[in-house]
Structures are given as C-alpha cells and as structure tokens.
Amino acid sequence: MYKRQGGIFDKQDIIHAINLGADGVQIASRFVATKECDASPAYKQAYINARQEDVQIIQSPVGMPGRALRNAFIKQLDNSRIPISKCYNCLEKCNPAKVPYCITKALINAVKGDVDNGLIFCGANVGRINEITTVHSLMKELSE
C-alpha cells in the first residue's frame, strides 16, 4: 500500500496522487485550521495569517528537518541557542547542554497559544489556508 503525504491541499492534489499510483493520502495542515482541532485559537490564527514566504525549513535538536512558520522563536534560533531550563527526557539522543533548543518546550508553548515563543510546524501549503472551517466542510470539499 502506497500512501502519499505532504503537499496535499485539495481534491485536485488527491486525484493527482491517486493517478500516480497512491492508494490513499494523508493530510495534516488543513485539519489544524478546523474548529474541531484542539490547538489554541492563536495557533490556528498563525496558520490563517501565514504566507508562503513565512515557511522555513528548520532542524530539530537531533537534526531532523521540518517546516515551521517563521516567528520570533525561529528568528532567535537564527542568531543564538535558546537555553534549556528543564529537560523533559523526550529524545534519547538529545543533550540539553548542546542542542540549540528544547523541542518539547517549544511545542508546548505553541499549542498553548504562545505562538511567538513556540515552534509552529506546518505543511508546505499553509499559505493557502485562509479560514477556520469544520472537519465536515473540509471533508466535503475534499471529496465532492
């Protein structure tokens, strides 16, 4: 079974993936901007406000790449390490004395609504999201 993930935004993307041989698709960012998503209103609004040029590839503390919205947290990382005050022991290979930031703290900040001091992971098409919708409406849009 082949599942296509990443870059799926609308029905045309789903059709294209299936035409290329995918058995299904995985969609993430579109569902963040739904009423049912438990992210804070500020987190969802960051998605709505995002432009394509706000997306930056960053490295996790253990070197894995990911797309994130450029904010005060990311700008600070560009210039310096963000000291870690508490280790959550979430990653075996993480050394709090050496890594540039604590990913757990950054994610907690963002989910709680501190979008300036948090890490807001997103998909490549986040700049195309322009409203908060419902899961029902989104599923209808993707399937009809």
Regions found by a protein language model. Name each.
Residues M1-Y2:
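Conserved small/polar residues in nucleotide/adenosyl-binding loops
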Residues Q5:
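Short hydrophobic "strand-cap" motifs at the C-terminus of beta-strands
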Residues F9-E144:
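Conserved active-site-proximal phosphate/metal-binding subdomains
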